[in-house]
């Protein structure tokens, strides 16, 4: 048992299986073979990920990370398609939360289309931390830093941002509040 092998204050970061974070079923080489029927399925995430992680690690379970595989950019060309994916992902994350569950959830997006003010604000509302990282499929570090600052409440809201029509992060003026 891993939990017994580490200091009491140690916490494991556990990554969710791609069965719930990848829109495609894949072959042994990682090539898409079709649509993944368990993509964004909260019941599968609880049964195959949360339960085993909590049972095996107990109090030593740290952040549970959902690395969302890239969706092909052509599939996200329209505002309607981006909003639909946004709603599916945030509904999935909301379904994973239970009041007072104490779980630390984090989300990593491999599509720049999901690094929007609307997504960061919804993650904050859900108590889900964004993951920042260096990967060819992820936006540049500047965009990720802006997203993290937005998640922390450092950017102002506008109707365009909240509707999903804008993906521009606009810093708040000094002394203003959300």
Positions of the model-derived regions?
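Residues lining hydrophobic/aromatic ligand-binding pockets adjacent to catalytic sites
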Residues: 1-178
């Amino acid at each position: 048992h891993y939990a017994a092998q580490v200091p009491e204050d140690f916490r494991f970061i556990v990554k969710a299986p791609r069965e719930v974070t990848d829109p495609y079923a894949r072959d042994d080489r990682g090539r898409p073979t079709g649509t993944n029927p368990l993509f964004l399925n909260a019941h599968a995430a609880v049964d195959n990920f949360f339960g085993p992680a909590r049972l095996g690690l107990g109090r030593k379970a740290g952040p549970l990370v959902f690395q969302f595989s890239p969706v092909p950019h052509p599939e996200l060309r329209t505002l309607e398609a981006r909003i639909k994916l946004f709603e599916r992902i945030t509904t999935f994350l909301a379904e994973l939360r239970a009041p007072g569950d104490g779980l630390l959830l984090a989300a990593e997006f491999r599509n720049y289309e999901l690094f929007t003010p609307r997504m960061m604000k919804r993650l904050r509302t859900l108590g889900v931390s964004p993951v920042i990282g260096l990967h060819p499929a992820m936006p540049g570090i500047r965009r990720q830093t802006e997203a993290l600052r937005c998640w922390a409440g450092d950017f102002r809201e506008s109707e365009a941002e909240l509707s999903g029509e804008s993906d521009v992060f606009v810093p708040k003026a000094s002394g203003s509040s959300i």
